[in-house]
């Protein structure tokens, strides 16, 4: 199970990567392994506002449909359209090819409230 140290993590198994004044968001390796084979990804539109702890999209696997929860507040500035045709990227490359959205945060300090890799690893061990 991969948990890159440079990322921050939410309790809902999303990861956040800071890139200048924007953040890239996706789901963790742990989340994709729990979901099984991903067959469909539904994401917001560019320009949509997302609110922390509220759904911004969903992933559908052969087992279930799971909502994606926003780890921070902000405005969607980019969406990974490759996932529309290749949802399997979520299983194959959750931290690289399968990023979900890029967001301009309303308040970048919210990122500091998310878990470090070590804290996230401790949380998933308890599950």
Curated annotation (Swiss-Prot):
Q: Which residue ranges does the record assign to the Lipoyl-binding domain?
A: 22-104
**InterPro entries hit by this protein:** 2-oxoA_DH_lipoyl-BS (IPR003016), Biotin_lipoyl (IPR000089), GCV_H (IPR002930), GCV_H/Fam206 (IPR033753), GCV_H_sub (IPR017453), Single_hybrid_motif (IPR011053)
Under the heading Gene3D superfamilies, the entry gives: 2.40.50.100
Domain of life here?
Bacteria
Q: What does the record say about how the cofactor binds?
A: Binds 1 lipoyl cofactor covalently.
Positions carrying N6-lipoyllysine? 63
User: What are the GO BP annotations of this UniProt entry?
Assistant: glycine decarboxylation via glycine cleavage system
A cellular component term from Gene Ontology for this protein is: cytosol
Describe the protein's quaternary organization and the partners it interacts with: The glycine cleavage system is composed of four proteins: P, T, L and H.
Q: Which PANTHER family match?
A: GLYCINE CLEAVAGE SYSTEM H PROTEIN, GLYCINE CLEAVAGE SYSTEM H PROTEIN-RELATED
Question: To which protein family does this belong?
Answer: Belongs to the GcvH family.
The protein here is known as Glycine cleavage system H protein
Source organism per UniProt: Bacillus licheniformis (strain ATCC 14580 / DSM 13 / JCM 2505 / CCUG 7422 / NBRC 12200 / NCIMB 9375 / NCTC 10341 / NRRL NRS-1264 / Gibson 46)
Record gene name: gcvH
